[in-house]
Amino acid sequence: MESLASLYKNHIATLQERTRDALARFKLDALLIHSGELFNVFLDDHPYPFKVNPQFKAWVPVTQVPNCWLLVDGVNKPKLWFYLPVDYWHNVEPLPNSFWTEDVEVIALPKADGIGSLLPAARGNIGYIGPVPERALQLGIEASNINPKGVIDYLHYYRSFKTEYELACMREAQKMAVNGHRAAEEAFRSGMSEFDINIAYLTATGHRDTDVPYSNIVALNEHAAVLHYTKLDHQAPEEMRSFLLDAGAEYNGYAADLTRTWSAKSDNDYAQLVKDVNDEQLALIATMKAGVSYVDYHIQFHQRIAKLLRKHQIITDMSEEAMVENDLTGPFMPHGIGHPLGLQVHDVAGFMQDDSGTHLAAPARYPYLRCTRILQPGMVLTIEPGIYFIESLLAPWREGQFSKHFNWQKIEALKPFGGIRIEDNVVIHENNVENMTRDLKLA
C-alpha cells in the first residue's frame, strides 16, 4: 500500500483543485478555515468537549486543538496557524511533525487573539468557514463572506467523493471499531452491564467517550427497540436475551459506524431472525453498484423486510407486495437504509444532486432516509437495515383493517428482545462495492 504521506500529498492536491474552482466560481481570493473554539457551560468556567470544524479536519488531521486557523487559496501551500500557548493549567499539544506536515506550512500561534496580525491585510475577499461568526467579523471578514452557502455547498458536494487518503483513514477506523465490537460481544457473553460493556468497547478501540464519533448505543434486551439508546444501565438485567451495539471509531478525523446484534441463545426464533436480517443485508450489498439511486436500495430492503415478516409469520395472510404497498413494513424498519459516511458520521450532501446544492428530498413515505444520491465511485455509505418491535409504532396497527394480519402473539414474544440492526460501511467503486467491515471478518 502507498504510504499515508504520499496519499496525503495527492489528497491535498485534490482539495487545492476544489478550492481553486470554488474561489473562481464565487469570486473569492482565499478561505480562512477555523478549527473552532472552546465554549463554556452556561454559568460555569468548564468547557464543553471540543469538536473540531469538519471542514478544518478535511485538510489536516488536527482534531483536538481549538484556536487553529488554515488559510487556503488553491495555489500556495496551505498555511496552518497552530495554537501553541504557554499554559501550565492545561495540556498543550506540541507543534505537529508528522506524515502530513511537509505539505502544509505550520506556524505556531502563541495567543488565540493574535491571529489578526498574521493574516493578509486585505481581507474583503476572504471567505470564513467556521463556528464563530463574531470572530470572523472581528477579523474584518465581510458578513456576506462568513460561511457563504454557495462555497459550503460546493465543498460539501465534493466531500462525497473520497480520496485514497480518506479511504485509507476510514479503513483504519474500521479496524479500531471491529476490535471494539469483538470486545463488546465478549463482555456481553460474560454477563456484563451496558455500562461495563461500553468500557470494554472504549478500551479495545483506544477511545474516550468524548472521542468516539457518536455516542455509543449499547442496548441490552428491550433497549434495542430504542433507535438511539444511550443511557447505559449500570446493572446487568437478570436475563440476557439480546444485545444491539451501534458504535464506531475515528482515525485522523474519519469515522467508522458499525452495528451488530447478538442473541444470547442460538436456538430461538429471535436468533434466526438476526441471522436472516444479516443474510438479507449481505444480499442487498451484493446487488449494489454505481449508477443506481440510494433510494432504490432503501425500497428494495422494505421488500426484503416483507419476506422476513412473512417467513417468521409476524405478518400473515398477505403478499409481500401488499405489505410494502400498504406500509406494513414501516413500523418494523422506521429508519433509512443508511447514510453517507466520512468526516462526519451522518456525512454531508446526502440530498445534493449537484455542486450548486440542488436538493432532492427523501420520498414522502420514507422521510427519515438521509440520502437521495445516485451512487458514484468514491462514495462511502452505511447499509444498516433493521427490524424492531416498538410499541408506539405498532399501536396504531392494533385496530383497523390490517390488524388481523399482524401476529400479535408472536410480536409480544419478540418485544422483550427489542430489535435487530446490522450495519456495514461500504465504498462504491467503478466496477465493484467494497465492504470495509466484512473485509475485516466481522461476522
From Swiss-Prot:
GO annotation, biological process: proteolysis
Paired cysteines (S-S): none
SUPFAM superfamilies the UniProt entry points to: Creatinase/aminopeptidase
Enzyme category, top tier: hydrolase
Textual note on the cofactor: Binds 2 manganese ions per subunit.
A GO molecular-function annotation: proline dipeptidase activity
Annotated positions binding Mn(2+) 2: D246, D257, E423
Highest taxon, organism lineage: Bacteria
The keyword tRNA-binding is annotated on this UniProt entry: no
Coiled coil region boundaries: none
Binding site for Mn(2+) 1: D257, H339, E384, E423
Cofactor(s) the protein needs: Mn(2+)
Keyword annotations: Dipeptidase, Hydrolase, Manganese, Metal-binding, Metalloprotease, Protease
Database matches in Pfam families: PepQ_N, Peptidase_M24
E.C. number(s) listed in UniProt: 3.4.13.9
Reaction catalysis annotation: Xaa-L-Pro dipeptide + H2O = an L-alpha-amino acid + L-proline
Any one of the GO CC terms: cytosol
Family of this protein: Belongs to the peptidase M24B family. Bacterial-type prolidase subfamily.
Function: Splits dipeptides with a prolyl residue in the C-terminal position.
Record PANTHER family: XAA-PRO AMINOPEPTIDASE 3, XAA-PRO DIPEPTIDASE
Protein name from the UniProt record: Xaa-Pro dipeptidase
Gene it is expressed from: pepQ
